[in-house]
Amino acid sequence: MQKIAGVKGMNDLLPGDAPLWEHFDNAVRSMLRAYGYQQIRTPIVEQTQLFVRGIGEVTDIVEKEMYSFTDALNGEQLTMRPEGTAAAVRAVIEHNLLYDGPKRLWYTGPMFRHEKPQRGRYRQFHQVGVEALGFAGPDIDAEVILMCQRLWDDLGLVGLKLELNSLGQAEERAAHRADLIKYLEGFQDILDEDSKRRLYTNPLRVLDTKNPALQEMAAGAPKLIDYLGEESCAHFEGVQKLLKANNIPFTINPRLVRGLDYYNLTVFEWTTDKLGAQGTVAGGGRYDPLIEQIGGKPAPACGWAMGVERIIELLREENLAPEPQGSDVYIVHQGDEAQVQALVAAERLRDAGLDVILHASAEGRNGSFKSQFKRADASGAAYAVIIGDDEVASGVVQIKPLRGDPNADAQQTVPSDQLVDRLIDAMVANSD
C-alpha cells in the first residue's frame, strides 16, 4: 500500500529535534516570568472576519495566504489563524479582561499561511508573542524590545540587529499617503504587479519591497517620519531614549512598515544575516487602533511575535544547541520474576524523582544482557540497574555506572530495598 506523506510545508517535530525546541521553550518561559506576563491560549480556528478586520483586507495575508473554509454545519466562514495578535485581542474583548486594568499577556502555538514553502517560511509555523494591553507610554514599547534582547542573551545569540520606525497616527499617515501616491504614480512604468496593485490600497507596502529594481525608487520616496506631529515625535524619541539608557543599539529604518495594517507609532524588527532571505526573527510594535477595530473599547496596545523555527535554525547555525541529556537510569533484566521486580524498581526510582528507562521486550524477546547493555549505553543513561533471576533470589540488584563516574567499571551489589538511597548517593558523589 502506498505511503501517505505529510503536507508540504507542514513539518514533523522529531525526537532528535525536540530537546532544542524544549530548550528554547524553557528560555522563553523563564524570560516571560521575569517580566510578569501571563499566558493566554486561543483556538486555532477563528471567524474569518476577525482577520479581515484586524489584519487588513488588502494585506498579503488576507488576500492570498489564509487557510479559510466554510463550516458545513452552519455556513460560518472560518480561518486557521495566520497570526496570534488578533485572536488574543478578540479573547481579551470577549472575556472583558481589561475590566480591572492593563494586562501583560503571552501566547505560543502553530500558525498557518498558504504560501510557497522555503527556508524559514512554512505553511504551518510556530510563534511566540506578547501583548501588553492598556499601556500608552513609550516605556512599554521599550520593555517589549528589551524582552527580546534578554531572550537573545539567555540563548547566547549575538549579532541580531534592531530596526525601528514610527508610523505615527492616522491623520499623519493620511497626509503622507497622499504625497506618497503622487510620488509613486511617477514610477508606474517600473512598478511590478504587486506594487501596482497596492498603489492605491496600501502604498506604504510598496516601499517595503524586496525587489532590487524598486529599492532605489523606495529610497527617494517621502518618509513617513517627516510627517510625524509633536506627540508622535515625542513618543518615538521616548522609546529611543529608553533603549539608549539600556545600551540597546538600533537603526532607524524609515521604510520599515510591517505587513499588518493594525500598527501605529512604534514598529520594530530584529533581523539576522545568517538565515538568507528570511532574516526577520521577531517583529512588532504598537497597535492602538486594533482593540476598537475588533469591537472593544479603545485601549492602547503593544507587542511582538517571533518565529520559532527561524530562531531554532539560528541556534543550530550558531552551534548553540544544548548537549543531549540522557536518563538517570536504564534497567536491564532477564527472567520472568526479574521482569516483575524491574518494573517495581523502576516505579520506586521514578517516585524518588529519577528519570528511568525500563528495557522492554521487542517482538516477544527480551534480548541478552549484552544486547540490553548496548541499548543502555546508547540511551545516554548515567547508570544501569541489573536484575536477573540470581539477583531476585538473593534480594539484591546491581548498579553499574555507564559514564561520568571515575570508577565507571565499578559495579556494586546492593540490597533491593536500598536501591533508591544507594543510587542517589552514587549520583550525588559523581556530581561533586
Curated annotation (Swiss-Prot):
CDD domains from the xrefs?
A: HisRS-like_core (cd00773), HisRS_anticodon (cd00859)
Assembly information from the UniProt record: Homodimer.
Identify the EC number(s): 6.1.1.21
**Where does this chain mainly localize?**
cytoplasm
What reaction is this protein's catalytic activity? Answer: tRNA(His) + L-histidine + ATP = L-histidyl-tRNA(His) + AMP + diphosphate + H(+)
Q: What is this protein called?
A: Histidine--tRNA ligase
Q: Does the keyword Nucleotide-binding apply?
A: yes
- Keyword check for Cytoplasm: yes
Any one GO molecular-function label of the UniProt entry: histidine-tRNA ligase activity
Listed GO biological process terms: histidyl-tRNA aminoacylation
Q: Which HAMAP family match?
A: His_tRNA_synth
Protein source organism: Ralstonia nicotianae (strain ATCC BAA-1114 / GMI1000)
Q: According to its UniProt record, where is this protein located? A: Cytoplasm
Q: Which UniProt keywords apply?
A: Aminoacyl-tRNA synthetase, ATP-binding, Cytoplasm, Ligase, Nucleotide-binding, Protein biosynthesis
Which family is annotated? Belongs to the class-II aminoacyl-tRNA synthetase family.
Report the enzyme's class at the first EC level.
Answer: ligase
CC annotations in GO:
cytoplasm
